[in-house]
């Protein structure tokens, strides 16, 4: 495992002129432990900044971590026995980011055993402006993507996931789908939800898991990035355990 100290060095001064190796497909055992990963990121992430001020450093920090540890920030898999459609957070790179999505997918695949997992990232800008304006159009676009996946993969168990602004996008997508369509969704899992406390429209609350940490300003409707908003990787196993019975 490559040293996490390298990550801190690369992020020092917010400079990224180094040649970054292409991410490789690796097993999670080659990643840092979740606690090590989060501890090191906490040293370099813009804790206490607004999302507007923090955007570039969030993107660069996740890019560096992805390159160092072979964590894929982009997923466009074919459908599996179970398929996750995941919307990343504001300023997260790729189409699934690094902070939350990959850890959840890995935990879910482990929990599924021999069943196949397909992951598809939601291709939306994840911009600061979209976050501040409610990401409405992105929700409409995700709703269309959901319908497309259900049509092309009628036998898959579809799970919707989102982190930060991505949770907002999932809420907006559900609001643009009727109950009959949403009934085909097996589970919804949201991390760091800006709409915390608001139910997912047209969907069974018993099949919804919303994880919001104490002290997460984003979950309180704010725009300040505090440490509790960056640590949802530690909930990956819990989220996977929630999903598995719903896709069995």
UniProtKB/Swiss-Prot annotation:
The lineage of its organism: Eukaryota, Fungi, Dikarya, Ascomycota, Pezizomycotina. Weakly inhibited by n-undecyl phosphonate (C11Y4). Activity unaffected by paraoxon. Residues 31-70 are annotated as: Lid covering the active site of the uncomplexed enzyme. It is found in: Secreted. It comes from Hypocrea jecorina (strain ATCC 56765 / BCRC 32924 / NRRL 11460 / Rut C-30) (Trichoderma reesei). The keyword Transferase does not apply. Residues 1-17 form the signal peptide. The 2 disulfide bonds play a critical role in holding the catalytic residues in juxta-position; reduction of the disulfide bridges results in the complete inactivation of the enzyme. In contract to classical cutinases, possesses a lid formed by two N-terminal helices which covers its active site. The lid opens in the presence of surfactants to uncover the catalytic crevice, allowing enzyme activity and inhibition. One of its GO terms (biological process) is carbohydrate catabolic process. It is an enzyme of class 3 (hydrolase). The active site is at 164 (nucleophile), 216, 229 (proton donor/acceptor). Catalyzes the hydrolysis of complex carboxylic polyesters found in the cell wall of plants. Degrades cutin, a macromolecule that forms the structure of the plant cuticle. SMART domains: Cutinase (SM01110). It catalyses: cutin + H2O = cutin monomers. Residues 18-28 form a propeptide. This is Cutinase. The record marks 90, 165 as: Transition state stabilizer. InterPro entries: AB_hydrolase_fold, Cutinase/axe, CUTINASE_1, CUTINASE_2, Cutinase_monf. Optimum pH is 4-7.
